[in-house]
Amino acid sequence: MNSNVFSLYNETKNMYAALKDAPESDDLISSVTAFTEKREEMLAGIKPPFSEEEKTLLQQVAAMDRLITGEVKRIQDGIRNEIKTLKKKRIYHNTYFNPYHQTTSDGRYYDKRK
């Protein structure tokens, strides 16, 4: 068995275990980045022909890759929602302390009397 295929399988399995049900954090993001860089190196070292066992491992890696992509998407959406929430909080905070700074045009009317 090609040791590169087996090590790729183990790394992918470890990464999926780390991502599953993990809260978003800077450490997690840096570990995902490190994993993708390491994985690129591993994929460059994998050359055919493959045995049946290697083919099944690569199929499992492909399946786990789809799951990892979903988890990364979930984390990305969570970060995006946090950024939106923080922007809203900042706007509400500024409006509370300086209510006349940003006036809106709704509620205005024009008096036709001269």
Curated annotation (Swiss-Prot):
One of its GO terms (cellular component) is cytosol. Keywords: Bacterial flagellum biogenesis, Chaperone, Cytoplasm. GO terms for biological process: bacterial-type flagellum organization. It is found in: Cytoplasm, Cytosol. May act as an export chaperone for the filament capping protein FliD. Belongs to the bacillales FliT family. Homodimer. This is Flagellar protein FliT. The gene is fliT.
